[in-house]
Curated annotation (Swiss-Prot):
<dbReference type="InterPro" id="IPR001592">
    <property type="entry name" value="Poty_coat"/>
</dbReference>
<dbReference type="GO" id="GO:0019028">
    <property type="term" value="C:viral capsid"/>
</dbReference>
<feature type="region of interest" description="Disordered">
    <location>
        <begin position="1"/>
        <end position="64"/>
    </location>
</feature>
<keyword id="KW-0007">Acetylation</keyword>
<comment type="similarity">
    <text>Belongs to the potyviridae genome polyprotein family.</text>
</comment>
<keyword id="KW-0946">Virion</keyword>
<protein>
    <recommendedName>
        <fullName>Genome polyprotein</fullName>
    </recommendedName>
</protein>
<feature type="compositionally biased region" description="Basic and acidic residues">
    <location>
        <begin position="16"/>
        <end position="28"/>
    </location>
</feature>
<feature type="modified residue" description="N-acetylserine; by host">
    <location>
        <position position="1"/>
    </location>
</feature>
<dbReference type="Pfam" id="PF00767">
    <property type="entry name" value="Poty_coat"/>
</dbReference>
<feature type="compositionally biased region" description="Low complexity">
    <location>
        <begin position="31"/>
        <end position="40"/>
    </location>
</feature>
<keyword id="KW-0167">Capsid protein</keyword>
Amino acid sequence: SGNEDAGNVKPAAGTKENKSDKEKDKPESGNAANAKATSNTKEDGGESGTKPTTANKDKDVDVGSTGTFVIPKLKKVSPKMRLPMVSNKAILNLDHLIQYKPDQRDISNARATHTQFQFWYNRIKKEYDVDDEQMRILMNGLMVWCIENGTSPDINGYWTMVDGNNQSEFPLKPIVENAKPTLRQCMMHFSDAAEAYIEMRNLDEPYMPRYGLLRNLNDKSLARYAFDFYEINSRTPNRAREAHAQMKAAAIRGSTNHMFGLDGNVGESSENTERHTAADVSRNVHTYRGAKI
């Protein structure tokens, strides 16, 4: 019947399912397991996109090649040199000394310091009652005037500046009195500008400063050094240095500085007790050997 056929089919189906479950639980053989692992590895590698790495080969070294030679660098200041010592300790910092390279003009005692020059400039501006822009024009005129007339501490009166055909006069008193240590040392700050100015004037026409004319300087190429506040430095040519020294020696030759001037109190305080009569020869002579003349 239909029910009996259905009952007979069910056990057959169950038997088939049990058989398939047993096949799943049955362990795989060794070769099959290795093959499966290999296939899984290939699939994983394909999915990740990685490629097998190969070892980097070292470059071949030529037996006849030589290495590089390094030139030894000597120390600029050797620590073995004899240094000033206090309590067996050096009092110099060599690391700072190697880097300390100041401009020789800034540490020269032949020119005014920056503080002294600033004080001189401000005092002149105050006494002339001008602003900074006007002071710059006056400094141009003062520099050119000093090129021609020098910077002697004995100068007095007025210095002049020309505006077209008009001549303007300015007192020298604030310039000389406020210059510390001296006017020449203050004017040495203008040395490079004065040298360039003389060179510029010579481009238009022959120009020799009065300082060079008085010293009878014949070489026109040395005109740029012919002013008394020129500052000699390491770049000064030998001929220019010699010419400047000769002009300076000629300018100060025969000049003497007296520490003391003539005392104004020259009267004598002694009392003259001599008595003279009208018959005396003179005020200081009574007679010659007792005879009247």
